[in-house]
């Protein structure tokens, strides 16, 4: 049976941790907190939160090792290992893309990744 996008998002949300916008801003007080905006570049350019890095959902898995806080940019595996236990928050427009992306990063082995519930619309 085929699944709708809404079903995929609901399934992802059952496996991940979501946080409120207030919890995100509290977490951002820690300079080691990573905020990744998974919206498309034109959405990011229109409005973005300070310190957010734009890795659209379609390329997140291939680019996360390039995050500025990764200390091993030349070695993908070492960069991923460096980032895997860092607090990572994902945000999008409404919370759907960030939920799916959070689920994917958890499957990659990231341990402290969370999705911002409701995204920018919250």
Residue ranges of predicted features:
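Nucleotide phosphate-binding site architecture
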Residues: 45, 61, 121
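Short amphipathic alpha-helical segments
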Residues: 46-49, 66, 102-104
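Short, charged, surface-exposed secondary-structure boundary motifs
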Residues: 62-68
């Amino acid at each position: 049976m085929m699944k709708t996008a809404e079903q995929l998002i609901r399934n992802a949300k059952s496996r991940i941790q979501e946080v409120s916008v207030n919890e995100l801003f509290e977490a951002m007080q820690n300079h080691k907190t990573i905020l990744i905006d998974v919206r498309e570049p034109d959405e990011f350019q229109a409005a973005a939160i300070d310190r957010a890095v734009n890795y659209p959902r379609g390329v997140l898995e291939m680019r996360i090792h390039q995050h500025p806080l990764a200390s091993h940019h030349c070695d993908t595996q070492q960069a991923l290992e460096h980032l895997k236990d860092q607090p990572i928050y994902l945000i999008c427009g409404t919370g759907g893309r960030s939920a799916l992306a959070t689920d994917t990063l958890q499957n990659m082995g990231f341990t402290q990744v969370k999705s911002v519930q409701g995204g920018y619309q919250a």
